[in-house]
């Protein structure tokens, strides 16, 4: 809803840090457009965007040299508008009244387009490295017609594992540090969610 829109505009205000070739680098938000293919949605534009995974994945897997977090929307004109917003004077982006107004306008726009474009999600992770001494690439994609359903499944899965006593990790942890892969895959199967993998 409107909170997601506010968060998006807040994230456009300042550069964020990401690990590139083993060094931390400041990245301009919503920059370096790249077109990727998502089977459910076809080709879609994605842009650098600050997500918590830029930090937590680097902490969880320190051997990774480069971590790129990108985001995009369908229809693509939302990407173009967000790109333009990111280029506004920073003082405008830090004007809370303007951000509040734009957040409400943006949310109303999605209410108009969502019936035709849907409210789905597509995620992609690509890992490049070495396997058995040779260059290798691993690609995983996840797509679903309902983003809110998937978010609920994720939250519900963690709650289920804690309440059933299968997950014991006191404190505050990123999911990738708290949840073993075997339990993650088990909860996906229970919810009939599928991650497609290619090696």
Positions of the model-derived regions?
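C-terminal catalytic/substrate-binding lobe primarily of soluble NAD(P)-dependent oxidoreductases
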Residues: 1-199
């Amino acid at each position: 809803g409107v909170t997601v829109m506010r968060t998006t505009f807040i994230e456009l205000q300042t550069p964020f840090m990401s690990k590139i070739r083993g060094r931390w680098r400041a990245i301009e938000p919503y920059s370096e457009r790249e077109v990727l293919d998502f089977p459910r949605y076809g080709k879609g534009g994605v842009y650098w965007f600050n997500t918590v995974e830029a930090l937590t994945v680097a902490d969880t897997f320190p051997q990774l040299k480069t971590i790129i977090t990108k985001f995009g929307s369908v229809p693509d004109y939302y990407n173009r508008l967000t790109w333009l917003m990111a280029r506004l004077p920073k003082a405008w982006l830090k004007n809370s009244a303007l951000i509040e107004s734009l957040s409400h306008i943006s949310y109303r726009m999605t209410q108009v387009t969502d019936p035709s474009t849907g409210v789905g999600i597509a995620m992609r992770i690509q890992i490049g490295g070495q396997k058995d001494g040779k260059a290798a690439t691993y690609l995983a994609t996840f797509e679903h017609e309902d983003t809110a359903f998937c978010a609920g499944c994720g939250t519900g899965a963690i709650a289920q594992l804690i309440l059933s006593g299968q997950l014991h990790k006191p404190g505050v942890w990123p999911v990738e540090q708290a949840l073993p892969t075997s339990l993650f895959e088990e909860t996906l199967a229970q919810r009939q969610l599928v991650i497609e993998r290619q090696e």
